[in-house]
Regions:
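A short SAM/SAH-binding and catalytic strip from SAM-dependent methyltransferases
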Residues: 50-63
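A short, acidic, amphipathic alpha-helical segment used as a generic capping/interface helix at domain edges
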Residues: 30-44, 72-77
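Class I S-adenosyl-L-methionine-dependent methyltransferase module
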Residues: 1-29, 41-46, 133-135
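Generic beta-strand/beta-sheet core signal
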Residues: 30, 54-55, 89-91
């Protein structure tokens, strides 16, 4: 939802809609844990990176589904190679801090975890840490 006086947010929304129209995403209905387990079990083409990305999603999952998804990602991470890397990118609230949203990336085969940014939930402000300053 976008209030009429939120011009910057409306511009971001319109840009996102234009991108989605130009490059329609594939949408699959189903259980998130089942889908993740299935997709990560599929063969990965050499020279491609696989990215699992979620935004303001994790908090709505039952704990069992969170555990299954995390286990599937960790299992896929163990088989990742430099030619077939895996990334887990999340934009989620961190209940242990008062900061708004946290942008985090974990990459395999190294298993490196990066805290890339702390952000306003709707993009009004971004404190970018990047790789060099990741906490």
């Amino acid at each position: 939802y976008c209030w009429p006086d939120q011009h910057d947010r409306l511009a971001r929304l319109e840009a996102a809609i234009a991108i989605a129209r130009a490059f329609p995403p594939a949408v699959a209905a189903g259980d998130a844990a089942d889908w993740t387990e299935h997709m990560l079990a599929e063969p990965q083409a050499k020279g491609t990176a696989r990215i699992v990305m979620h935004s303001v999603f994790w908090q709505y999952l039952p704990v069992d589904a969170q555990k299954r998804i995390e286990a599937a990602i960790l299992k896929a991470g163990k088989t990742a190679t430099p030619d077939c890397p895996l990334g887990w990118l999340s934009f989620e609230p961190d209940p242990s801090t008062i900061s708004p949203m946290q942008l985090r990336l974990r990459v395999w085969p190294s298993g490196e975890s990066l805290h890339l940014a702390a952000c306003h939930p709707h993009g009004a402000s971004i404190n970018w840490y990047g790789r060099e300053n990741s906490a």
